[in-house]
From Swiss-Prot:
Entry GO MF terms: large ribosomal subunit rRNA binding; structural constituent of ribosome
Organism name: Exiguobacterium sibiricum (strain DSM 17290 / CCUG 55495 / CIP 109462 / JCM 13490 / 255-15)
Name of the protein this chain belongs to: Large ribosomal subunit protein uL11
Subunit structure: Part of the ribosomal stalk of the 50S ribosomal subunit. Interacts with L10 and the large rRNA to form the base of the stalk. L10 forms an elongated spine to which L12 dimers bind in a sequential fashion forming a multimeric L10(L12)X complex.
Keywords, sorted A to Z: Methylation, Ribonucleoprotein, Ribosomal protein, RNA-binding, rRNA-binding
Family, as annotated: Belongs to the universal ribosomal protein uL11 family.
Keyword Transcription regulation included in the entry's annotation: no
C-alpha cells in the first residue's frame, strides 16, 4: 500500500547550502521531518550547481519520511547570472539594466524546458524573454 502524503513543502534554497536555519528548519520542523537528513541529501544532490537558487518540492508522508524533487533554477536567476547583474530594474519600462544575446536566452530556455509547459524551445524562449523584459533586461540578436 502506498504511503499517505501528509504535506507538500515548496522552498527555494541556494544549491549546496541547505542548513537547519530559516527558511528550511521551520518549514520542515512543522512537518516533523529529520531536518539534518534533508539538508545532507539536498546538499549532496545540488553541490555541482553552486551559486544558483534551486526550487525544491518536499513530499512529507504520515510516517514522517520524505522525498524531494529538485527543479531547474528560476529564469530570473539564470538571466541575472547571464547578464552579470545583482538585481533587475526597479522600473523595467523606463530603466534598462543589461543586455543579453538571443543565443544565451535559447540556452536558458533549453535549461528550463523540463519545468516549463512549453511545446517547443521557441515558446520557452518567449517565456524567458518576457521574464527578461520584466526585469529591465534588453534582448539583442
Amino acid at each position: 500500500m502506498a504511503k499517505k502524503v501528509m504535506k507538500l513543502v515548496k522552498l527555494q534554497i541556494p544549491a549546496g547550502k541547505a542548513n537547519p536555519a530559516p527558511p528550511v528548519g521551520p518549514a520542515l520542523g512543522q512537518a516533523g521531518v529529520n531536518i539534518m537528513g534533508f539538508c545532507k541529501e539536498f546538499n549532496a544532490r545540488t553541490q555541482d550547481q553552486a551559486g544558483l537558487i534551486i526550487p525544491v518540492v518536499i513530499t512529507v508522508f504520515e510516517d514522517r519520511s520524505f522525498t524531494f524533487i529538485t527543479k531547474t533554477p528560476p529564469a530570473a536567476v539564470l538571466l541575472k547570472k547571464a547578464a552579470g547583474i545583482e538585481s533587475g530594474s526597479g522600473e523595467p519600462n523606463r530603466k534598462k539594466v543589461a543586455t543579453v544575446k538571443r543565443d544565451k536566452v535559447r540556452e536558458i530556455a533549453e535549461t528550463k524546458m523540463p519545468d516549463l509547459n512549453a511545446a517547443s524551445v521557441e515558446t520557452a524562449m518567449l517565456m524567458v524573454e518576457g521574464t527578461a523584459r520584466s526585469m529591465g533586461i534588453v534582448i539583442e540578436d
